[in-house]
Amino acid sequence: MLDYNHRPTCAERINAVIDKAIAAERAAVAPRTYLGGSRLGHGCERALQFEFAGAPKDEGREFSGQTLRIFEIGHALEDLAIRWLRGAGFDLYTRKGNRPDGEQFGFSVAGGRIRGHVDGIIAATPQLLGIGVPALWECKTMNARNWRKTVAKGVVVAKPVYASQIALYQAYMEAQVPGISDNPALFTAINKDTAELHHELVPFDAGLAQRMSDRAVRILQAMDAGDLLPRIA
């Protein structure tokens, strides 16, 4: 009798155990107990409210092993970008004291209920570039389609969530790094498919930062009052 049942290939079996290990590693990380500044540009405040409350994902909507691998590859590429910029003469600080064991730069407000961690702070650049410092540095990895869109339209139009993060971080980091909001942030986008790099100077948008801060306060107030914010599809 012919057996038409699919039998996992060697690659599928290996990937399955890898994904299981990655998922277990992620599950062991304590969940966030704060509103992350990197997420406040999301269009749906109810979704952000659910994230802050630690609501479990709908069944079948958990991150797949492949998605978790994509996240980790993004972090690895960010580390490469840091090395490349430093090698090119950028004085780029990613941790306090620029030590591997140093704390990541970031901010904490509203009793620790709103927090953010920055990718880096630029203290100096090659003089010929004419980039003002200190400056915030934020790095994202993208597939080719999203990368091309960002190059063509700019991060503010193409990726408003990222633009919101940049503005908020410039505002809240001013207390720790005076002058950081006076200078445009440097946004780096890495094309994961081709290794092309896009760099863009993003001036501080005080109005956008204020709107994101107001949104965070609105979410916290709704949580404290037990109210459910409107859902935006």
Task: Please state what every model-predicted region is.
Residues 54-55, 140-145, 190-194:
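Short connector loops/turns at beta-strand edges and beta->alpha or beta->beta junctions
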Residues 93-94, 136-138, 184-189:
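A structural signal for short, well-ordered beta-strand segments and their strand-loop junctions
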Residues 1-136, 143:
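Metal-dependent nuclease catalytic cores that hydrolyze phosphodiester bonds in DNA/RNA
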Residues 6, 149, 153-163, 168-233:
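Metal-dependent nuclease catalytic regions and adjoining charged, substrate-binding loops involved
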Residues 121, 138-140, 188, 203:
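Residues in well-ordered beta-strands of folded domains
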